[in-house]
């Protein structure tokens, strides 16, 4: 063979080889798990169907199974549901599932899914393929699950999205993933599927959880403990049960939280456990130390290490219960709780709340507003503030609203309790310059009785909305009266509490700009300055915030309040001074926070370790000072004393001080700065009251401050800090600017506010002028310097050292 022929043969061979390689690459490309088809779909979870092998899809999964379904080992494992959407049986021999892109994954055994059938796989990490199926991985937030056919192609994928416990991600008929409060493992994602799943949940022991109530405010009064959460257990056997070996808990990690009493439960008999109630020591009641949460909670009944019954407590409406009915498997919601009696009239679900298809809020320069609603079953509505019932008008066409008012709507459907109430506020042609807050109570009569009583300590279900610059929020909450002296005034302070029983455990919204955006409590506050300058409390706290003081301070915004559609004047929406506020400031768990309201109880740990130690020991001795400084944050104490003295708060003697600490932070006591209506009236006077052994606060906080003034380090830190603030953030100019800014913010609203309560706004104008006079003409800054020099007994050289650059004396 000539060299020319050999070259021709070589070229032909290379061409053939290249063609073969190209064909192989083309064949393998769509099947390679290293680059799954439609991988980007994980950003928007949905089942991804390949061109072939798309007969089986992922139809539902749960990444935080706490009390929905147990595997054969008794564990609450994550799970994944597969659905055969074809018209023929499909063998899973050769199919794989993985939680990593490019991984071959866990191999299915030769199991068959019938046409339109479902297969449940536990993602437990146990790696079992005989009998119950368990993958070799578990589910985690922000990962994606891939289902691979025998050819290696990705037939479906689903992204885990960080759902709450016992909430599944379910694939709807239109291919969208949605969170489901009613999981259906092994059944179709529908009401019928959920009912079938529940009917398959039969009790495994003679002692069962029969009924649970997590928001009991007026249904079951238990004597001394009052109204509290409760759990009813029942003996469903025909023999006696000794309870001493059983425990009840809300935690899988601590099943023995509450041991049942050493007593016997006869056949058909029940026992009620009160949860979260204070122990009166009488031994009369069965008291579990833990309380329950209706938005996301689990309950476990155990014997030894074995869980014999469990319940997932999710989305239980206010004053409703959750439990079982005689002769029925699974769980029901009850509109009429029946502690100690047979459960009846239960429904499997709670209807979903109606949806507003148009905007609610503030509308100016309009003739009317159109309201469009949507919902399952029958939607019924009211316009008079009452909660819709089955006899209320049915929504069949858009509603026209032409004046300020409230629209409420509820869904009614067979097989479910009525939905929670949709509350819509319409503030029409009112012309407000401030943000608008709308507070709507569930029952207007009950609210009126509470507000006008006034009945402090009563909490009623309500809804709160904020409308500001075209945005805002609406959230369910509880409302109660707040404060002491203000309760006899025209505008009363109100506390807002977010709870799962109302439909939302916390409010997540950036109300104040920066800082915490999640709230358990808020205040609607008018204060004692409401008939004078209005701004004193907010002026003091705004100066505190802008000076970056090391105290726990409340943020707030001015607003106009409507209550049940009626104008109620100027208020502030603000944070509440409690453990949740300090937890947000310190970045700790609220349960780790201890708050003590002054005056501290005599003989208490705080009193003995802090107040008594300071009073009984010479704090000029560094060792004693350092010991106290290990317990009390000195910067916080100094800043609190400066702010209280600077603002001349004459109401601090009534106990408007709270100490707070957390072992998750520095463990030291910090000081809360709040309730400042009685400020800016008598300049300089409060330093003597706070920091003199003959002052009004001598009984407690003075006992802490006066001994500290004898310590050179504390004295130097205090006076240096005071001089720094008085020369800048607390200068006369800074205070005057703040007064003018707040007065300008309120000026357009004051006339209507004062007229609403039968007064004239000229008194407000006089009070604003009086504030400016005290600060400017009376030289507020100089009055503070003089007061501090007097209290500390400064010599002329010391006075010059600390205040020389700003001292006009």
Specify the residue positions occupied by each region the protein language model found:
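Middle-to-C-terminal accessory/interaction subdomains
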Residues: 186, 323, 330, 339-347, ...
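Short, compositionally stereotyped local motifs that mark structural "simplifiers"
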Residues: 11, 17-18, 30-47, 57, ...
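Beta-strand signatures of extracellular beta-sandwich domains
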Residues: 96-98, 146, 247-249, 298-300, ...
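Conserved ATP-binding subdomain of kinase catalytic cores across diverse folds
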Residues: 439, 454-604
């Amino acid at each position: 063979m000539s060299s020319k022929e050999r070259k021709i043969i070589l070229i032909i061979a290379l061409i053939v080889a290249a063609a073969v390689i190209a064909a192989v690459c083309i064949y393998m490309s769509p099947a390679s798990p290293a680059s799954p088809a439609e991988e980007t779909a994980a950003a928007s979870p949905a089942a991804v169907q390949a061109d072939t092998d798309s007969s089986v899809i992922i139809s539902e999964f749960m990444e935080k199974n706490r009390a929905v379904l147990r595997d054969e080992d008794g564990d609450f494992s994550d799970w994944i549901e597969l659905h055969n959407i074809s018209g023929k049986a499909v063998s899973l021999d050769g199919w794989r599932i993985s939680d990593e892109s490019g991984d071959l994954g866990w191999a299915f055994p030769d199991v068959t899914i019938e046409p339109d059938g479902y297969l449940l796989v536990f993602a437990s990490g146990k790696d079992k393929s005989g009998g119950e199926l368990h993958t070799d991985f578990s589910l985690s937030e922000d990962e994606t699950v891939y289902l691979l056919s025998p050819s290696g192609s990705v037939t479906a994928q689903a992204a885990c999205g960080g759902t709450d416990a016992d909430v599944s991600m379910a694939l709807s008929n239109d291919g969208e993933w949605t969170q489901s409060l009613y999981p259906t493992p092994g059944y179709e994602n529908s009401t019928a599927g959920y009912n079938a799943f529940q009917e398959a949940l039969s009790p495994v022991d003679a002692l069962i959880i029969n009924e649970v109530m997590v928001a009991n405010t007026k249904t079951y009064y238990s004597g001394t403990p009052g109204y509290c959460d409760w759990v009813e257990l029942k003996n469903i056997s025909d023999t006696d049960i000794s309870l001493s070996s059983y425990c009840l808990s809300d935690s899988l990690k601590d099943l023995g939280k509450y041991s049942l009493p050493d007593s016997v439960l006869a056949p058909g008999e029940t026992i009620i456990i009160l949860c979260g109630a204070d122990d009166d020591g009488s031994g009369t009641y069965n008291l579990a130390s833990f309380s329950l949460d209706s938005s996301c909670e689990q309950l476990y009944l155990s014997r030894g290490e074995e869980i014999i019954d469990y319940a997932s407590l999710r989305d239980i409406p206010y004053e409703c219960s959750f439990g079982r009915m005689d002769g029925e498997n699974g769980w029901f919601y009850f509109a009429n709780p029946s502690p100690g009696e047979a459960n009846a009239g239960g429904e499997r679900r709670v209807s979903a709340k109606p949806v507003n298809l148009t905007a609610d809020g503030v509308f100016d320069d309009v003739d009317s507003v159109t309201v469009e609603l949507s919902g399952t079953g029958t939607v019924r509505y009211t316009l008079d503030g009452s909660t819709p019932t089955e006899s209320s008008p049915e929504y069949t066409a858009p509603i026209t609203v032409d004046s300020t008012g409230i629209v409420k709507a509820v869904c009614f459907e067979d097989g479910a309790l009525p939905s929670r109430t949709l509350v819509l506020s319409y503030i029409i042609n009112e012309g407000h310059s401030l943000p608008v807050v709308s507070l709507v109570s569930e029952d207007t009569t009950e609210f009126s009785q509470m507000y006008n009583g006034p009945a402090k300590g009563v909490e009623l279900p309500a809804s709160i909305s904020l409308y500001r610059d075209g945005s805002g929020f609406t959230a369910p909450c509880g409302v109660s009266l707040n404060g002491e002296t203000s309760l006899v005034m025209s505008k009363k302070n109100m506390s807002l509490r977010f709870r799962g029983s109302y439909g939302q455990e916390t409010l997540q919204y950036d109300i104040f700009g920066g800082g915490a955006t999640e709230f358990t409590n808020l205040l609607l506050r008018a204060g004692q300055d409401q008939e004078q300058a209005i701004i004193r409390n907010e002026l003091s706290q705004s100066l505190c915030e802008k000076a970056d003081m090391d105290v726990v301070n409340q943020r707030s915004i001015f607003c106009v309040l409507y209550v049940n559609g009626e104008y109620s004047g100027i208020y502030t929406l603000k944070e509440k001074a409690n453990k949740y506020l300090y937890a947000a400031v310190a970045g700790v768990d609220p349960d780790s926070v201890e708050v003590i309201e002054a005056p501290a109880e005599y003989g208490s740990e705080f009193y003995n370790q802090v107040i008594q130690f300071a009073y009984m020991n010479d704090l000029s001795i560094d060792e004693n000072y350092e010991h106290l400084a290990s317990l009390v944050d000195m910067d916080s104490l100094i800043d609190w004393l400066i702010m209280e003295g600077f603002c001349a708060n004459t109401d601090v003697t009534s106990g408007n001080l709270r100490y707070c600490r957390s072992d998750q932070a520095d463990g030291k006591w910090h000081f809360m700065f709040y309730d400042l209506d009685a400020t800016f009236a008598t300049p300089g006077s409060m330093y003597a009251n706070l920091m003199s052994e003959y002052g009004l606060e001598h009984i407690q906080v003075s006992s802490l401050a006066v001994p500290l003034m004898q310590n050179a380090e504390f004295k130097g830190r205090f006076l240096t800090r005071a001089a720094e603030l008085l020369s800048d953030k607390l200068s006369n100019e800074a205070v005057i600017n703040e007064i003018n800014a707040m007065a300008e913010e309120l000026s357009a609203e004051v006339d209507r506010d004062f007229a609403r309560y039968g007064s004239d706004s000229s008194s407000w104008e006089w009070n604003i002028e009086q504030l400016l006079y005290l600060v400017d003409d009376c030289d507020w800054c100089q009055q503070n310097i003089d007061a501090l020099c007097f209290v500390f007994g400064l010599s002329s050289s010391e006075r010059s050292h600390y205040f020389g650059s700003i001292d006009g004396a």
